[in-house]
Amino acid sequence: MKNFINIRDISAKNLRKIIFDAKLRKNKRKKLNALDVDKDNPLRGKLLVQMFEKSSTRTRLSFYLAIRQLGGGALNLRADELHFAKGESLPDTAKILSTYGNAFMLRTDSDHKLEEFKKHMTIPIINGLSPSSHPTQVLSDVFTIEEIKKKPISKLQICWIGDPNNNVINSLIEASVKFSFKLIIGCPKKYYPNKNLLIWVKKNKGKIKIFNDCKKAARLSDVIFTDKVVSMNDKTNKFKKLKDFKNFQVTSKIMNCAKKNAIFLHCLPRGSEVTNDVFFGSQSRVFQQALNRIYVQKSILLYCFEKLR
């Protein structure tokens, strides 16, 4: 049994195995419908219990399809539907979920809660998003980049424009170390990545640079990422933050600073951090990016069940 909580906790070798398996499985589904089961049916009869404390579109749908295509089934729960929301202890809830299900995916508003579920569960647990991390999204993004660019991400320059301290960029920073790629962050002054994460990056010889000018950050990059400036976990002054980031919108001028064949990625949902012409433009790959979550999450599930080929 293995868990999938943070990218930094998983070896580069196992992360690469997940991506390799996802590529094989995607190639074998070209003539199959969304609910058709993979021929090897590796998780036949397995139940994935999903609990959502926060709203979800792509994570909910992609994990549902992932477990179905592997031969299993999914049960979606909201915390407020359970006795857990009305006083039943977390350890008791974890034991019950472990009794009924074979794996547990949690989308939560608390990193502490995620760790407590991990401590008390006897089945694999997957982080479907927490305040500090979104590992399933970012591993899927690495897959998408390599699929489009047809080369290892270690040979590419990745640029992030926007908030340098949210769950997606945290996982992207961790991935930059595990996959050895150059990561450039463009953000306003007085905004910085998580300090403890930067210490970990330095200790592991990561390749990260920070610019307070988004044109300089985007220069000669192969991929431009962004995300909502005000995320689901933000407790800061919304209007002040939007004002601080007004010059860090991804526009066609920013894309023109990157390489001619650069692509644009966004985990969604979007706000004002990207213009429509970029989002719907020829360099945007956001819908391919969203689709690929199914395939990578299938391989994450197999990793957790120790059934990776």
Report the location of each language-model feature.
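Active-site cofactor/substrate anionic-group-binding motifs, chiefly glycine-
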Residues: 47-100
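Anion-binding alpha/beta catalytic cores of soluble intermediary-metabolism enzymes, centered on
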Residues: 30-32, 95, 102-175, 266
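Rossmann-like adenosine-cofactor binding region
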Residues: 202-278, 283-284
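Glycine-rich phosphate/diphosphate-binding loop of Rossmann-like nucleotide-binding domains
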Residues: 53-65, 147-226
